[in-house]
């Protein structure tokens, strides 16, 4: 009988033989090294294996790594296209330096040493002159755990900026206020009921590993409940689809919570033991007895409004469906899993309260740390300790965490251009790494204005594997490696286990297998494409060549004192000293830990891991539960905080418990007679990811982002499928095509945020198969018009497929027309927009965009007025128990 296998066995990876498909029917045997790495095209950290041709060293194919515990041999379309990225005719292969004005498109090739010397000189001068606060590193999806934070700490710089506040900060805050952990880790595979507040099955965080386990759980009989105003592919898989009106999810969740409490179908003993109900009664219900029975009375009165019938009015979901969902959750018991990352939480003002309401259901069911329930992320994510950790920064960077946002999760990154326009500071040296704020963030033309202003940003260094709209406005474009061209460690909370993955430059590894000496990764990669891990070491030595600044010592070898560390030494030390079980596993195969990770690309730290740390007995600290002192949760009360006294003490007492609070686009406030809609602009496609995926195979699948509009609304507007429509926002408009569907709530329009890439030059500045050529005309007073000249077209290159590009549409860039809308508590940009939709005018063309940046800045000030600034009750900038990247010394918290 034939032995069918999905992957070659690791024992074959050093010399795998396959037939060359392009030689068929001739049997042309080719030999490959199969070298594992980690995909770099989202944050799931899925394992991949690269088939490296032994003759040409070309990466011929990418598949999933079968020994990777998170992804288990599977990869999505974004992983498979890695060879497209490697061979992209429009990728950047050599370091470039700007010659003309920023944005002019005039570049010259420079050496790595020239770039390092210039950039290091600026940084050294800023450090010597005590201007560390003018150094900033701004990253999108990092694809690594902790390496660059260590670099910034070594420099003494509080300069880590991120994309979190256009991604997940409201969900993070909602989770953190409950447990002291800002991310959940659902055990979908073993759940009896799974509740998703998004199209999580097809495009969520973490897409591939979670999708596998959701379907696994469903195949074992789990009930899948999906709350999504769109009939997404996830909704289509649901046993119960609940298309709630956007922003009303809190009403739905509280109705379910009320039902569970009223019927007694909740885990009463867990709630009694682990929720800070005593504090809640003392603060809000002094007239009730300080007993759990008193808390139950208070809870029922607190949420008495939220009957299924009330929720039906608010959400549009029939009351019977709400009861059905509640019964499914009750039936699951502790095997109830759920997840919230973006979607509703990221879309709305007070979106973190939606997450608070969602987690209330987890708490009521006692599903924390249980099989089929929800873990805390740090139970399942493993971050190894590096050698010689530097001390924390000694100051607080107000451009990252301004006083107005003491509770933000995390840096107020998308407000940076407005802060600089207001004169709050200046950035001397600004690194963007795999981050494209001009395109990804709202209000991109304000970013463009600031990026062109050298008085606000002295030097912009774009660390990027590809061209982007933002890189076009930089001083240096430094090409960095993709998923098979770089070193990183990475782990994610994908399931109820713990693992560590290792990304590595596969051509470098292959050359070393050939016996060739490779000094730096750019000697092995195409052109002179480098990797950040080596780049930061080289740059740090340039900044502090003699060690007098106290920086160089953190980049010296732990094995060769005084000499520059190599990446083999950096990761070798980590794998030898910081990964439990790895040295023993390696020794069983007569390998070093580094050799083991190079061979397999991943290591399973724990096969099964559930969050039980809160139950561990302790001698001091912690919290007393039924007469036993235990560790508890990482909150001030050491309990699950139904009532957050932090919120109450830091100026938000009305939000101290989970509440339903309508957001900035409330369906009752829309003027439907004036054709106002709620624009849902933040849903994702399973084939694309922000700005890393403009490659031929993906865009052949997904290359347009029409405006979803319900059949009912389209008929009222007189719009048919394919018609041009103009969508007016608070600061401008964009023109796109309508897609008429029954799969969307009335009063809502929706548009995927992945597409609409553009470039300003015909043959550089963007992927020609995935971007449109545009003109941008400044009309004065902050007004800009963008018009597409043409979309994707066939073109000649070394890749014969470039002449076969058959699609022309590459979508419309909607984010340019969105004002910044920061949630005053979490700092999250609230993505949903109140818009007016109309048929396009005669002179309108597909892809037209108009923006008024002066109006945008005025609206920025309106939203800033909603904040309640620090200091808090203890005179600090931020609660000491709150997480933040690059946490400074305690004295820096003082205002």
Model-identified regions with their sequence ranges:
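A residue-level signal for beta-strand positions that form part of recognition/binding surfaces
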Residues: 32, 59, 73, 134, ...
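Non-catalytic alpha/beta scaffold blocks inside enzyme catalytic domains
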Residues: 170-350, 355, 365-370, 378-379, ...
